[in-house]
Design a protein with these regions (language model features):
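Long, repeat-rich segments with strong aromatic
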Residues: 39, 50-53, 340, 347, ...
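Divalent-cation-assisted or electrostatically stabilized phosphate/pyrophosphate-binding catalytic cores
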Residues: 218-239, 289-310, 334-338, 360-385, ...
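Structured soluble/peripheral alpha/beta segments that form catalytic or ligand/cofactor-binding pockets
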Residues: 1-105
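Proline-centered turn/helix-capping motifs that create local helix->coil transitions or kinks
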Residues: 129-133, 269-282, 385-392, 403
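Alpha-helical phosphate/pyrophosphate-handling elements in metalloenzyme active cores
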Residues: 145-197, 247, 300-343, 380, ...
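All-alpha helical catalytic cores of prenyl diphosphate-utilizing isoprenoid enzymes
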Residues: 141-150, 166-171, 234-235, 251-360
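Short hairpin/turn module used for nucleic-acid contact or packing/dimerization
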Residues: 57-122, 151, 421-464
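Conserved N-terminal diphosphate/IPP-binding helix and adjacent helical/loop segment
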Residues: 105-203, 207, 211-226, 280-298, ...
Length: 464
């Protein structure tokens, strides 16, 4: 891009100068729009012998608006130091910066969120010990002793987790948490440290899930237990649950707030483990009755409860924690918590449907769940509509755990014939719409609220 400096003299004359060198450093990410903005600049104009350092007076000077691409631009006060013609100069100034790291759709927004989440987790989970004081405060606690190999702690507790988080992820839990906090707050809130709650709770469960499921691939790479061993993976995965509470700074709040946050957090953990236990046990014991009778109400409720305990409940808890942290009303808290629960449930329903439709970019082979014999949302929906002969056929193929592409496709075709897959997507949309109505009514309009709404629409239309 062309760079032009304009010198304005004391009489108001303006002289354009094209030999200009500008560089920037120290990026700041807005928790409203997830756009990055430089906080410091170097400006050098040889013709004027002008060499300046420009620094933002403070970071949160974004102007959030739907009138520009990306939802905002940077506009605020700066301090200036440097030299002109060899003499020291200083002063105050004003800067406006548009579209530094913009996006055009919700997918672009989520990429920005994911990039920031990876950066933040890299800070929170360092591959090398930042200092003994940091390790004592956040990891080892008041029983920290001399002789502890701090690098080994990082190697065994942090490095396995980073192997997974550095690959990225959808990061929608963090988007919901952060957007909830800023939608509830009159002033901008830097809630980046609370990302530890949303991400480490999730990634810890992924590591443990992969061990229990004997999986080998996660996020395009080897599962943590494959590269680091089962023992280390279990320790690092479980450790994430406790590091989340430490790194998010729950103990920095007044005792009454701490108590609410800890109660919510451990409630989500307990329910999540109950859900995982139910998932491990499976739903096969309910299938004979559903296949024989075509009655699927209890079977569907059982799967729905697993999805809520494992995913929806955690998302709802994050929304409720946002309400505690911002002093929201009971009406707002109830609306947002239910919204989080339904978003998590809808996410899992869409996942089940996409597994049969196929993921964009061939991220997974269409029908993996059929091959693995999983009783999923589309399967249950179909069992309530298929003939008894077709129900028996579907159940037979599921029990085979077959890799036969023809058989897998035949089951998918039967599910499609009764619109079971599309009906799952419709149900997910309805869940979101119904849950959004009270949120829309109780939360004041803001860009953060709009970000949440945009994600809701994207959730049920996504292709991966």
């Amino acid at each position: 891009k062309e760079k032009v400096a304009v010198l304005t003299d004391g009489k108001g004359g303006r002289i354009p100068i094209h030999d200009v060198q500008i560089s920037y450093e120290k990026l700041w990410t807005s928790m409203t729009t997830y756009m990055e903005y430089p906080m410091q600049w170097k400006l050098f104009v040889p013709e004027l012998q002008l060499d300046l350092r420009v620094k933002a007076a403070f970071s949160a000077q974004e102007f959030a608006t739907v009138l520009v691409q990306g939802g905002g631009f940077y506009e605020g006060r700066v301090t200036v130091t440097g030299s002109r013609q060899g003499k020291a100069v200083s002063g105050k100034g004003f800067i406006e910066r548009k579209n530094h790291t913009t996006f055009t759709d919700t997918e672009g927004l989520l990429k920005n969120v994911g990039r920031f989440v990876r950066q933040k987790l890299a800070e929170m989970y360092p591959l090398e010990p930042p200092s003994k004081q940091w390790m004592d405060k956040y990891v080892l606690g008041r029983n920290a002793t001399a002789g502890t190999d701090l690098q080994k702690v990082c190697d065994t507790l942090f490095k396995p987790v980073r192997a997974l988080t550095d690959r990225g992820g959808k990061s929608w839990r963090s988007l919901i948490l952060v957007s909830s906090m800023n939608a509830l707050s009159k002033d901008y809130v830097d809630c980046s440290r609370y990302i530890a709650l949303s991400e480490l709770l999730h990634v810890g469960s992924l590591i443990i899930d992969d061990i229990q499921d004997e999986s080998v691939v996660r996020r395009g790479g080897k599962c943590v237990h494959i590269d680091y061993g089962v023992a280390t993976a279990i320790n690092a995965g479980c450790g994430s649950y406790f590091m989340a509470a430490s790194l998010s700074g729950i103990d920095d709040h007044p005792p009454a707030v701490q108590l609410q946050l800890y109660n919510l957090y451990f409630d989500a953990l307990r329910a999540g483990h109950a859900g995982q236990g139910l998932d491990i046990a499976g739903l096969d014991h309910l299938m004979p009755h559903a296949v024989e009778s075509g009655e699927v109400g209890h079977l569907l409720d059982s799967l729905r409860s697993i999805h809520i305990y494992k995913t929806g409940g955690a998302a709802g808890t994050l929304c409720r924690m946002a309400c505690v942290l911002t002093g929201a009303s009971t009406e707002q808290a109830n609306a947002l918590e239910n919204f989080g629960v339904q978003v998590g449930l809808a996410f899992q329903i869409v996942d089940d449907a996409l597994n049969l439709k196929g993921f964009e970019g061939d991220l997974k082979e269409a029908g993996e769940d059929i091959r693995d014999g999983k009783v999923t949302y589309p399967v249950i929906k179909a069992l309530g509509r298929l003939t008894k002969a077709d129900r028996e056929y579907v159940w037979t193929i599921l029990q085979e755990h077959t890799g036969d592409r023809g058989k897998v496709q035949s089951v998918i075709d039967k599910l499609k014939s009764v619109a079971a897959i599309e009906d799952c997507l419709v149900e997910a949309r309805n869940l979101i719409e119904d849950a959004w109505e009270p949120v829309d009514r109780t939360l004041p309009d803001s860009l953060s609220k709009l970000m949440m709404r945009a994600f809701c629409s994207y959730l049920t239309e996504r292709t991966y």
